[in-house]
Regions:
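N-terminal, motif-rich segments that launch catalysis or mediate targeting to/interaction with membranes
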Residues: 20-132, 139-207
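Sec-dependent signal peptide recognition
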Residues: 2-8
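Cleavable N-terminal signal peptides
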Residues: 8-9, 19
């Protein structure tokens, strides 16, 4: 499971690209690329815990359930605060809301001992990892701790004149909508191009 998590994390980290917004298409593309880089054994094991579904199927799950009573505690997990130098530290953690790093690290700790967990616990924490890795690589989800980023911006593309959009929605939806009319698989084909040796170096991590 530890190798499985590393593959998920590295796949999303190194194949995420600013061309995405992180609505459904962005999250599913990140998950699709991660899925393509899983071993057959890891993929089979993950899908066992996910009820036969792929990680792509659950890529957007956290957004769909964050406002439900059962998962309301995860509502603050979708962003991560940084200081003026773009550095994160645990001192920036709001203990009442948590953040993406807190949620991701918590899920990884549980999954490292997945054999001791119930199937439902493994499943929900896999869903957290699948989604939060994507969120962590969307610019709108990394926020200055002293700034809430709740404002509108003018966004113009080749199809429309400048319109006001909530800044978060520009990254989540508008950019991908106007950049290419591609399917999730087509995005994955275009972005998942690193040679095997580079992928192995990435998965090895850094000290």
């Amino acid at each position: 499971m530890k190798k499985l998590l590393i593959l998920l994390l590295c796949s999303a980290l190194f194949y995420s690209d600013p061309v995405f917004g992180w609505g459904r298409e962005g999250h599913e593309t990140i998950a699709k690329i991660a899925e393509r880089n899983l071993t057959k054994r890891a993929k089979k094991r993950i899908e066992k815990y996910l009820g036969g579904h792929s990680i792509v199927y659950y890529a957007k799950w956290m957004d769909e359930y964050r406002k439900t009573p059962e998962y309301a505690f995860t509502d603050g997990w979708h962003t991560a605060p940084v200081d003026a130098r773009l550095h994160y530290s645990d001192e920036l953690l709001n203990p009442k809301r948590g953040n993406a790093i807190y949620g991701l690290e918590s899920a990884i700790r549980i999954l490292e001992n997945y054999r001791e967990q119930s199937d439902s616990t493994v499943a929900v924490n896999l869903k957290y990892v699948i989604h939060l890795v994507g969120d962590m690589h969307c610019p709108a989800h990394i926020k200055y701790a002293t700034h809430d980023m709740k404002y509108d911006v003018l966004f113009e593309d080749k199809y429309r004149k400048a319109h006001k959009f909530y800044v978060h929605s520009v990254w989540d939806n508008e950019i991908i909508t106007v950049s290419r009319i591609w399917s999730v698989s087509e995005w994955a084909d275009e972005l998942d191009r690193l040679p095997k040796s580079d992928k192995q170096a990435i998965a090895a991590g850094t000290p």
